[in-house]
Curated annotation (Swiss-Prot):
SMART domains: PKS_ER. It is found in: Cytoplasm. The modification N6-succinyllysine is found at residues 234, 340. Zn(2+) 2 binds at residues 98, 101, 104, 112. CDD domains: alcohol_DH_class_I_II_IV (cd08299). Its cofactor is Zn(2+). One of its GO terms (biological process) is retinoic acid metabolic process. Signal peptide: none annotated. InterPro entries: ADH-like_C, ADH-like_N, ADH_Zn_CS, GroES-like_sf, NAD(P)-bd_dom_sf, PKS_ER. This is Alcohol dehydrogenase 1. Homodimer.
Amino acid sequence: MSTAGKVIKCKAAVLWQLNKPFSIEEVEVAPPKAHEVRIKMVATGICRSDDHAVTGSIAVPLPVILGHEAAGIVESIGEGVTTVKPGDKVIPLFTPQCGKCRICKHPESNFCLINDLGKPKGMLLDGTSRFTCKGKPIHHFIGTSTFSQYTVVDEIAVAKIDAAAPLEKVCLIGCGFSTGYGSAVKVAKVTPGSTCAVFGLGGVGLSVIMGCKAAGASRIIAVDINKDKFPKAKEVGATECINPQDYKKPIQEVIQEISDGGVDFSFEVIGRLDTVVAALLSCHGACGTSVIVGVPPDSQSLTVNPMLLLSGRTWKGAIFGGFKSKDSVPKLVADFMAKKFSLDPLITNVLPFEKINEGFDLLRSGKSIRTILTF
């Protein structure tokens, strides 16, 4: 029996208050309006950015359905939708691609102006929500809200992918893998034979290492205070691993000493101000590039001596690995299907969706790289 055009009642993980567990609730998901798509979720990853929203490090209006790294199947479409149809396998895009704004038309940038990241409204483009719980509207999260059996997204925020793709793996292309991999190959533009340092060895950090390796880096130094993460870092391409706690001097001085004055490319994949500076200082003062990948705490500032850049360093950042989402996600899935990279090393835990709080406990304890929730 078709559900198209009807309200769907389903389970979703609702965050009612900051720093509280998710509550599995029955929610009502309204049909998609014009240029919107309703998706039946199949798998969603738990990303550190979701936890940043739980703690308030990323500001979000409450109550909210979080989740942004996922894959599913189109259940129904609103009027005027042309890029997907019911039954298509898709990945929602937290960085949309409208194709019309100044940024979408820019050859190098991808941060579409129609995003809900900077000052989130928690609504779809028409300013309203498709979620209701206990008679109250529930906010969307960066246009995706994948911690729900069904979600509604704007057409500019969804990409059709290969019908044969395993959704419980390629969901990582919706955020973590692409963010890390693209930071190396597209944002930093790592060169063959170069030296790299990667701060933070979670799922995104490991994806940065995979990107550095794919780009031909000859030396990849992995940095983390959790040495349990070192074997996996080496498995995906790190040539050496160092723990800042093993040294009396600052880690940037250690890296400068072992890399002839600094690496060619450094990446901060944690989201801490002290490591952002350490990563910047770890790249060579005259020719190094440092990329901010991790999401830093909202409304915190940094004091940096401009002389650090005057000598020739480059300091940059990007959302979603610099990839134009609607164009790039299908290609990344095709590359995965062609075995150009593996996502298996990133997936450490698979849990049923109802165990979402357990999945977040694994993330916070450092015991998982990526936990996938299946519906």
